Amino acid sequence: MSMKIEVYTKLYCAYCQRAKELLRIKGMDFIEYDITDDQLKAAEMQLRSQRQTVPGVFINDTLIGGCRELFDLDEQGELDVLLGQLTLPAESK
């Protein structure tokens, strides 16, 4: 299955830089939408996420959240699973 990762960012946003760096470390390609001067893309992000803050991270059209949520998922080991880099162990029967 092809993974689609989209990240809405602003030019001088440190949180955006951190989120993108984490995705790069994970070896993931992503589509970046710089909404610094793009009102149309900013409105699109707000409509999709129901929030106005960046970054806005979407994986397969599902809102993951921002930088904090992305790092929280990583710390819990759930980001690798979500990105398809790790599978959950099968439950014992």
Predicted regions and their residues:
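Local sequence-structure signature of Cys/Sec-based thiol-disulfide redox active-site neighborhoods
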Residues: 1-29
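Short alpha-helical
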Residues: 14, 40, 65
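Thiol-based oxidoreductase modules, predominantly thioredoxin-like and allied folds used
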Residues: 29-41
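Thiol/disulfide oxidoreductase modules built on the thioredoxin-like
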Residues: 47-53
